[in-house]
Protein backbone atom coordinates (compact mmCIF):
# COMPACT_ATOMS: atom_id res chain seq x y z
CA UNK A 1 0.00 0.00 0.00
CA UNK A 2 2.76 2.44 0.99
CA UNK A 3 4.71 1.52 -2.14
CA UNK A 4 1.64 2.19 -4.33
CA UNK A 5 1.14 5.61 -2.72
CA UNK A 6 4.79 6.53 -3.32
CA UNK A 7 4.59 5.48 -6.97
CA UNK A 8 1.38 7.48 -7.39
CA UNK A 9 2.95 10.54 -5.72
CA UNK A 10 6.01 10.30 -7.98
CA UNK A 11 3.75 9.96 -11.01
CA UNK A 12 1.84 13.11 -10.02
CA UNK A 13 5.09 15.03 -9.53
CA UNK A 14 6.30 13.91 -12.95
CA UNK A 15 3.05 14.97 -14.65
CA UNK A 16 3.08 18.35 -12.87
CA UNK A 17 6.72 18.99 -13.84
CA UNK A 18 5.98 18.21 -17.50
CA UNK A 19 3.10 20.71 -17.54
CA UNK A 20 5.23 23.25 -15.68
CA UNK A 21 8.10 22.88 -18.17
CA UNK A 22 5.67 23.30 -21.06
CA UNK A 23 4.21 26.45 -19.48
CA UNK A 24 7.68 27.89 -18.89
CA UNK A 25 8.66 27.15 -22.47
CA UNK A 26 5.62 29.09 -23.69
CA UNK A 27 6.51 32.04 -21.43
CA UNK A 28 9.98 32.50 -22.87
CA UNK A 29 9.06 32.24 -26.52
CA UNK A 30 10.90 34.76 -28.65
CA UNK A 31 8.03 35.15 -31.11
CA UNK A 32 6.27 38.52 -30.86
CA UNK A 33 3.46 38.43 -28.35
CA UNK A 34 0.01 39.88 -28.90
CA UNK A 35 -0.17 41.05 -25.30
CA UNK A 36 1.52 44.16 -23.94
CA UNK A 37 5.11 43.27 -23.22
CA UNK A 38 8.68 44.45 -23.22
CA UNK A 39 11.83 42.72 -24.41
CA UNK A 40 14.98 42.31 -22.33
CA UNK A 41 18.11 41.16 -24.12
CA UNK A 42 21.86 41.31 -23.82
CA UNK A 43 25.00 39.30 -23.20
CA UNK A 44 26.06 37.65 -19.97
CA UNK A 45 29.81 37.76 -19.40
CA UNK A 46 32.07 35.76 -17.08
CA UNK A 47 34.47 38.16 -15.34
CA UNK A 48 37.80 36.62 -14.30
CA UNK A 49 38.62 38.30 -10.99
CA UNK A 50 42.38 37.69 -11.20
CA UNK A 51 42.94 38.46 -14.89
CA UNK A 52 40.41 41.30 -14.98
CA UNK A 53 38.97 40.24 -18.33
CA UNK A 54 35.58 39.08 -19.55
CA UNK A 55 34.36 36.40 -21.91
CA UNK A 56 30.79 35.35 -22.78
CA UNK A 57 29.32 33.07 -20.11
CA UNK A 58 27.88 30.00 -21.82
CA UNK A 59 24.50 28.79 -20.56
CA UNK A 60 24.23 31.04 -17.49
CA UNK A 61 20.98 30.56 -15.60
CA UNK A 62 18.32 33.27 -15.59
CA UNK A 63 15.46 33.19 -13.08
CA UNK A 64 12.57 35.67 -13.28
CA UNK A 65 10.22 36.50 -10.41
CA UNK A 66 7.01 38.39 -11.19
CA UNK A 67 5.55 40.19 -8.17
CA UNK A 68 7.81 38.03 -5.94
CA UNK A 69 6.56 34.72 -7.37
CA UNK A 70 8.62 32.47 -9.63
CA UNK A 71 7.66 33.29 -13.20
CA UNK A 72 10.19 31.42 -15.35
CA UNK A 73 13.72 30.00 -15.26
CA UNK A 74 15.92 29.19 -18.24
CA UNK A 75 19.50 29.30 -19.53
CA UNK A 76 21.21 31.82 -21.78
CA UNK A 77 22.81 30.76 -25.04
CA UNK A 78 26.19 29.14 -25.61
CA UNK A 79 27.48 32.56 -26.72
CA UNK A 80 26.22 34.25 -23.54
CA UNK A 81 23.26 35.94 -25.21
CA UNK A 82 19.78 36.03 -23.75
CA UNK A 83 16.46 37.49 -24.86
CA UNK A 84 12.97 37.24 -23.40
CA UNK A 85 9.63 39.06 -23.25
CA UNK A 86 7.84 40.09 -20.06
CA UNK A 87 4.29 41.45 -19.72
CA UNK A 88 3.92 45.08 -18.61
CA UNK A 89 2.12 45.98 -15.39
CA UNK A 90 4.25 43.99 -12.93
CA UNK A 91 7.37 44.23 -10.81
CA UNK A 92 10.16 41.82 -11.70
CA UNK A 93 13.30 40.57 -10.07
CA UNK A 94 15.63 38.88 -12.54
CA UNK A 95 18.49 36.75 -11.17
CA UNK A 96 21.47 36.10 -13.41
CA UNK A 97 24.00 33.38 -12.59
CA UNK A 98 22.66 30.21 -11.04
CA UNK A 99 24.94 27.89 -9.07
CA UNK A 100 27.98 28.56 -11.29
CA UNK A 101 28.29 32.25 -10.38
CA UNK A 102 27.62 34.79 -7.67
CA UNK A 103 24.11 35.90 -8.67
CA UNK A 104 23.35 39.46 -9.69
CA UNK A 105 19.79 40.69 -9.37
CA UNK A 106 17.97 43.22 -11.50
CA UNK A 107 14.80 44.89 -10.19
CA UNK A 108 12.37 46.15 -12.83
CA UNK A 109 9.30 48.20 -12.01
CA UNK A 110 7.11 47.81 -15.10
CA UNK A 111 3.89 48.81 -13.31
CA UNK A 112 3.85 52.28 -14.90
CA UNK A 113 4.92 51.18 -18.37
CA UNK A 114 2.16 52.24 -20.80
CA UNK A 115 0.28 49.51 -22.60
CA UNK A 116 1.05 49.58 -26.31
CA UNK A 117 0.93 47.32 -29.31
CA UNK A 118 4.66 47.68 -30.03
CA UNK A 119 7.14 46.04 -27.69
CA UNK A 120 9.67 48.15 -25.82
CA UNK A 121 13.23 46.95 -25.71
CA UNK A 122 15.73 46.98 -22.87
CA UNK A 123 19.34 46.01 -23.58
CA UNK A 124 21.36 45.00 -20.55
CA UNK A 125 24.72 43.25 -20.54
CA UNK A 126 25.59 41.52 -17.26
CA UNK A 127 29.02 40.66 -15.88
CA UNK A 128 29.17 37.69 -13.48
CA UNK A 129 32.00 36.15 -11.50
CA UNK A 130 32.57 33.07 -9.43
CA UNK A 131 32.15 33.51 -5.68
CA UNK A 132 35.34 33.31 -3.63
CA UNK A 133 35.24 31.49 -0.30
CA UNK A 134 35.97 33.83 2.59
CA UNK A 135 34.88 36.99 0.75
CA UNK A 136 31.63 38.73 1.66
CA UNK A 137 29.47 39.30 -1.40
CA UNK A 138 26.29 40.00 0.60
CA UNK A 139 25.98 43.24 -1.38
CA UNK A 140 24.47 40.99 -4.06
CA UNK A 141 21.64 39.85 -1.77
CA UNK A 142 19.79 42.98 -2.89
CA UNK A 143 19.26 44.04 -6.52
CA UNK A 144 22.45 45.36 -8.11
CA UNK A 145 20.51 47.39 -10.69
CA UNK A 146 17.10 49.05 -10.42
CA UNK A 147 15.11 50.00 -13.48
CA UNK A 148 11.79 51.78 -13.94
CA UNK A 149 9.73 53.62 -16.53
CA UNK A 150 10.63 57.28 -17.07
CA UNK A 151 7.67 59.15 -18.64
CA UNK A 152 9.86 62.12 -19.69
CA UNK A 153 12.04 59.98 -21.93
CA UNK A 154 9.23 57.44 -22.54
CA UNK A 155 11.63 54.60 -21.82
CA UNK A 156 12.87 52.23 -19.17
CA UNK A 157 15.77 53.82 -17.27
CA UNK A 158 18.39 52.48 -14.89
CA UNK A 159 18.67 54.25 -11.53
CA UNK A 160 22.28 55.35 -12.15
CA UNK A 161 22.92 56.71 -8.65
CA UNK A 162 21.71 53.51 -6.97
CA UNK A 163 23.79 51.33 -9.32
CA UNK A 164 26.90 53.49 -8.84
CA UNK A 165 26.69 53.04 -5.05
CA UNK A 166 26.26 49.28 -5.44
CA UNK A 167 29.24 49.12 -7.81
CA UNK A 168 31.51 50.93 -5.33
CA UNK A 169 30.62 48.38 -2.63
CA UNK A 170 31.01 45.40 -4.96
CA UNK A 171 34.37 46.68 -6.24
CA UNK A 172 35.69 46.63 -2.65
CA UNK A 173 34.75 42.95 -2.32
CA UNK A 174 36.19 42.12 -5.75
CA UNK A 175 39.48 43.80 -4.82
CA UNK A 176 39.68 41.68 -1.64
CA UNK A 177 38.85 38.55 -3.66
CA UNK A 178 41.58 39.29 -6.20
CA UNK A 179 44.14 39.81 -3.44
CA UNK A 180 43.10 36.55 -1.75
CA UNK A 181 43.22 34.56 -4.99
CA UNK A 182 46.62 35.96 -5.96
CA UNK A 183 48.09 35.21 -2.53
CA UNK A 184 46.74 31.64 -2.70
CA UNK A 185 48.59 31.09 -5.99
CA UNK A 186 51.79 32.24 -4.31
What are these language model-derived features?
Residues 1-8:
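Positively charged n-region of N-terminal signal peptides that target proteins for export
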Residues 8-17:
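Sec-dependent N-terminal signal peptides
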Residues 23-39, 45:
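Beta-strand-rich domain onsets/edges
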Residues 24-31, 111-154:
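Extracellular beta-sheet/turn segments enriched in Thr/Pro/Gly and aliphatic residues
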Residues 38-40, 49-67, 149-153:
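Short, ordered, surface-exposed loop/turn motifs in non-cytosolic proteins
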Residues 67-81:
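Short, acidic Ser/Thr/Gly-rich low-complexity loop/linker segments typical of extracellular
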Residues 83-92, 99:
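Short Pro-Gly-centered beta-turn/loop motif in secreted/extracellular proteins
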Residues 95-111:
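A short, solvent-exposed loop/turn motif at the edges and junctions
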Amino acid sequence: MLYTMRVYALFLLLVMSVFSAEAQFRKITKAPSTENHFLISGVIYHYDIVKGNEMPAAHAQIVVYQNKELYVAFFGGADGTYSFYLPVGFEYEVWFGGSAFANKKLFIDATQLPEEKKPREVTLDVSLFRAVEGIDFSILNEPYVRMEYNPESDSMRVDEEYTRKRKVELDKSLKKAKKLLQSAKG
